[in-house]
Amino acid sequence: MVLAGKIYNVVLFILVMKREVWNRIILVGFTIILIAIEFYSLKVDSHYKWDFVFLLALLLAVYFLRDKIKLHPFHFFLLGVFLVLHNLGVFETYSKFYFGIEYDFWVHSYFGFVSALMLYRTYNLVGPYKGWFKYLAIVAIVLGFSAFHELFEYAGAVLLGEGEGVLFIGAGDIDEWDTQKDMRNNLIGALIAIGVYWGYNKFYPKIKPLHKFIH
């Protein structure tokens, strides 16, 4: 019983640790992971060596905006996972299928999921949108992110041609409906995130200490 009590206290301490500390830990941790993948990309001379610049910039940008967007460490962690999942393309994951579905679907859906979670929290705490319009705004912004990404990819494909990574056209991009499918997948992820957050807020608002950790 004494040991169980100590374990419980440790878990509580971890859950309620200052969010600023967690965000710093997550920033450092995923920076190290991205650097490690970058070394491999340089070693094999993969085009993913250029993606490192954009991924690290995104990670740092979100971190520096953490106060304005009320960034939660759990959401920041999920974003870091997305960045790593994308960069795992250096191992040719985008040309493979997992659970019968192409890798590109999982990554785009996951990005929509994470983005919607972050936006939902921001709008709940500081955003001007309320009610059902909040959900529409989240979907619109996620699709906006997706559209920007597709235009960025298109510009890279036109200027640089075939290759790997976000700047080139390669595995996962050859379908003539790739843009529409990517945006659809982002939308799927966003809708799932909205459903999860809405359901949690409606049915489990009193859970402690997890409520404090998640919110």
Language model features with spans:
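N-terminal amphipathic/basic-hydrophobic helices that include classical n-h-c signal peptides
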Residues: 1-16
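Bulky hydrophobic segments
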Residues: 13-164, 169-171, 187-215
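Membrane-interface transmembrane-helix boundary segments in multi-pass integral membrane proteins
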Residues: 175-188
